[in-house]
């Protein structure tokens, strides 16, 4: 997927759940498990203690709208729980009804620890983004984190901020 050059150092990748490119010799279900199990292989290779999170899009937009087999994401979530690794889902493209559910995560019946979102919040008309965190993350932030200083690309845009009061 990332053949155009190196990405940030220290990040590891697994194969995308792209059946048409990598799995035509298998059924969708066989390939879904095969692709998801690549995460467990990578965890065992690197050591779970060296992995903070698994990050992915429910449906990969930048890869050409790669729709994974139905069993891919549930298996990814199972592996993340087994090794106590955060599951972060990028819903910038899939969120807000684009898969027929509110989020792509809902389509695959998974419960991520963190969801990133944008675009669909305002249909792309206003620069607005956000994150949602589950109790696994929020409890630590509230109970142990102290002040949470942050700044984002869209911070302080007056039109976007006015939407909060609607």
Regions found by a protein language model. Give the residues of each.
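Conserved N-terminal phosphate-binding loop of PLP-dependent enzymes in the Aspartate aminotransferase
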Residues: 1-164
């Amino acid at each position: 997927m990332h053949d155009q050059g190196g990405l940030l150092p220290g990040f590891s990748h697994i194969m995308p759940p792209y059946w048409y490119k990598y799995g035509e010799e298998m059924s969708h279900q066989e390939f879904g498990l095969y692709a998801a199990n690549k995460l467990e292989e990578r965890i065992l290779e690197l050591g779970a203690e060296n992995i903070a999170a698994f990050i992915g899009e429910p449906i990969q937009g930048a890869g050409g709208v790669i729709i994974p087999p139905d069993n891919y994401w549930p298996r990814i979530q199972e592996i993340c729980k087994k090794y106590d690794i955060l599951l972060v889902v990028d819903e910038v493209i899939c969120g807000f009804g684009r898969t027929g559910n509110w989020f792509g995560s809902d389509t695959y019946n998974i419960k991520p620890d963190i969801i990133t979102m944008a675009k669909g919040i305002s249909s792309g008309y206003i620069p607005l983004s956000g994150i949602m965190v589950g109790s696994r993350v929020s409890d630590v932030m509230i109970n142990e984190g102290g002040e949470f200083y942050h700044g984002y690309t869209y911070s302080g845009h007056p039109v976007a901020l006015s939407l909060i009061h609607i």
